[in-house]
C-alpha cells in the first residue's frame, strides 16, 4: 500500500511542494555551472562537445551513470550535432541540482521516522509517525507499507529502500 505510505509520511510536504515555486539556482551555483561550461568551451564557440558532459558534471560534484548521460544527450542533442550550448547545459545542471536537493529532503524525512537512530525504519517507527500525523491505519496496513518498501527482506526499511519508494511517488 504505497499510497498509504506516501500519505502517512508526507502530509505536510505535499502542501509545501504545491505552494513553493520551481527550484531556482543561486547566483553562485549559476556561476559555478558557467565556469565548468567555459572550461570545456576551449575554442570559445559557446558550445561544448556532448562527450564532455560527464566530465563537466563531475567537475560540479556529480557522478552520472553512463545510461543517465546517454539519456541526457538524446534529450538535448536532438539534431545529432554532438554539441551542447550553455542554455542546455544549465537546464541539465539545474535539474541535477534539484534532484540532489530532493534526495536531501527525503533523507531528512527518513531521519524523522528513524527516531531511534538505527539506520532503519521499523514497524514501531512507522506506527509512531502514523499516530503523530493522526493517520488511523491498522497494524496490517502499516506492515504492508513496510513490506512494500523492504527489498532485502529484513522486515525494516533502510535509507536506500526509503529513497526508492519515495521517488516512486509524485511528491518528490
Swiss-Prot record:
Required for self-assembly: annotated segments: 2-25
Domain EF-hand: 28-63, 64-99, 101-136, 137-172
Record GO terms (molecular function): calcium ion binding; G-protein beta/gamma-subunit complex binding; heterotrimeric G-protein binding; microtubule binding
Gene Ontology CC: 9+2 motile cilium; apical part of cell; centriole; centrosome; ciliary basal body; cytoplasm; glial cell projection; nuclear pore nuclear basket
Keywords for the protein's UniProt record, in alphabetical order: Acetylation, Calcium, Cell cycle, Cell division, Cytoplasm, Cytoskeleton, DNA damage, DNA repair, Isopeptide bond, Metal-binding, Mitosis, mRNA transport, Nuclear pore complex, Nucleus, Phosphoprotein, Protein transport, Repeat, Translocation, Transport, Ubl conjugation
Residues bearing PTM N-acetylalanine: 2
Region annotated Disordered, chain positions: 1-31
Residues binding Ca(2+) 1, per UniProt: 41, 43, 45, 47, 52
Superkingdom per UniProt: Eukaryota
Main location: cytoplasm
Coiled coil: none
Residues recorded with modification Phosphoserine: 20
Secretion signal span: none
Miscellaneous note of the record: Binds two moles of calcium per mole of protein.
Family designation: Belongs to the centrin family.
Described purpose of this protein according to its UniProt entry: Plays a fundamental role in microtubule organizing center structure and function. Required for centriole duplication and correct spindle formation. Has a role in regulating cytokinesis and genome stability via cooperation with CALM1 and CCP110. Involved in global genome nucleotide excision repair (GG-NER) by acting as component of the XPC complex. Cooperatively with RAD23B appears to stabilize XPC. In vitro, stimulates DNA binding of the XPC:RAD23B dimer.
PANTHER family: CALCIUM BINDING PROTEIN
Protein name, per record: Centrin-2
